[in-house]
Amino acid sequence: MTEDLSQLSFEDALAQLEEIVRQLEGGQLRLQDAIASYERGAALRRYCDTKLNEADARVQAIIQRADGALETKSMD
């Protein structure tokens, strides 16, 4: 679980987060393992939130030109 989050795709991070939630909800983890899983889950949630915000910004940057064509607005 020491994998660098920046190396994960959004989908992989979300899958890991979902698995952690299942394990925590199952109630079978030892206390130390549950705490470590909770910490990892919190980091994964922040990472996924950042990725979603980045994707939203890209979508919001798409504008429609006068001729109806779509273009990507520069984020600069």
UniProtKB/Swiss-Prot annotation:
UniProt keyword annotation of ATP-binding present: no
Top-level EC class as recorded in UniProt: hydrolase
A GO molecular-function annotation: exodeoxyribonuclease VII activity
Any Gene Ontology biological process: DNA catabolic process
Domain of life: Bacteria
EC number: 3.1.11.6
Keywords, sorted A to Z: Cytoplasm, Exonuclease, Hydrolase, Nuclease
A family per Pfam: Exonuc_VII_S
Catalytically driven reaction(s): Exonucleolytic cleavage in either 5'- to 3'- or 3'- to 5'-direction to yield nucleoside 5'-phosphates
A GO-annotated cellular component: exodeoxyribonuclease VII complex
Localization, UniProt: Cytoplasm
NCBIfam families assigned: PRK00977.1-3, xseB
Subunit structure: Heterooligomer composed of large and small subunits.
Family the UniProt entry places it in: Belongs to the XseB family.
Free-text function comment from the UniProt entry: Bidirectionally degrades single-stranded DNA into large acid-insoluble oligonucleotides, which are then degraded further into small acid-soluble oligonucleotides.
Protein name per Swiss-Prot or TrEMBL: Exodeoxyribonuclease 7 small subunit
